Regions:
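Extracytoplasmic/periplasm-facing segments of secreted or lipoprotein envelope proteins
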Residues: 114, 120-147
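Membrane-proximal, non-transmembrane interface segments of integral membrane proteins
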Residues: 37-128
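Amphipathic alpha-helical segments in well-ordered regions
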Residues: 30, 134-139, 205, 209
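Short, charged amphipathic alpha-helical segments flanked by flexible coils
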Residues: 140-170
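Charge-enriched, short contiguous segments at helix-coil
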Residues: 171-176, 182-218
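Non-transmembrane, amphipathic alpha-helical segments
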Residues: 19, 23, 116, 120-124, ...
Length: 218
């Protein structure tokens, strides 16, 4: 029975990306108009059109530092854990379901967002933010943090850093990505090239998250 439930959950997850793509294509003009109406609003995190590109470049620099980080405390934990090989979006969602975590609509595949960006970069970044929030909530659950259901994504990010689940640099990078994606959600103009730069930055965090999934947290 448990296997049957797992399969049903998995099928529902696989259907999500196709549903989202259909909605974006079918109602792209309408959704874009909603974005356009918000352009005059003050953007969160102090991001304006003039500094949006600067934020992306700052995030790229932090991402390089995150990629070079060595975390010996996590290396010790991994030595005692069984390593699960994760290669595809199917593997990702299957593993998350096994660990009692919420699956990802995109299967954490960057190519999924690159495809969306070719239609509407802002919508793609909005979707990326959803996955980023899901990853952080799953990390909090994986590291057994007691998080209030009303906690904001920034509060969760801070709790993860204080617990040592993420490094200071990862914390900084997540905050930068939240600033960038929030600006996109609030209607700032984003080029496909800029969106793809952000996806490559996100790829670093996704890889770290995959590593956590592979050994199943502490």
């Amino acid at each position: 029975m448990e296997i049957a439930n797992l399969v049903l959950e998995y099928i529902k997850v696989l259907a999500w990306p196709f549903t989202v793509v259909f909605i974006l294509i079918a109602f792209r003009k309408e959704v874009s108009k909603l974005f356009d109406k918000t352009k005059k609003l003050e953007l969160p995190g102090g991001i304006s059109l003039e500094v949006f590109e600067e934020k992306i470049q700052e995030a790229k620099q932090i991402a390089k530092e995150v990629e070079k980080e060595e975390r010996p405390e996590l290396a010790e934990i991994r030595k005692t854990k069984e390593i699960h090989i994760i290669k595809t979006d199917a593997d990702v969602n299957k593993r998350m379901l096994e660990l009692g975590l919420k699956p990802s609509p995109s299967g954490l595949q960057i190519s999924y967002y690159q495809e969306l960006a070719s239609k509407d970069p802002r919508l793609a970044l909005a979707g990326l933010r959803i996955d980023l929030e899901l990853m952080l909530k799953n990390l909090a659950k994986g590291f057994q943090l007691e998080i209030d259901t009303k906690s904001s994504i920034r509060q969760i990010n801070n709790e993860l850093r204080e617990r040592g689940a993420i490094s200071n640099k990862q914390y900084e990078l997540i905050n930068k990505l939240l600033q960038i994606s929030n600006a996109a959600v609030h209607g700032i103009e984003v080029s496909e090239e800029q969106a793809n730069e952000v996806f490559e930055i996100m790829r670093i965090l996704v890889q770290d998250y995959m590593n956590w999934l592979s050994w199943g947290f502490p």
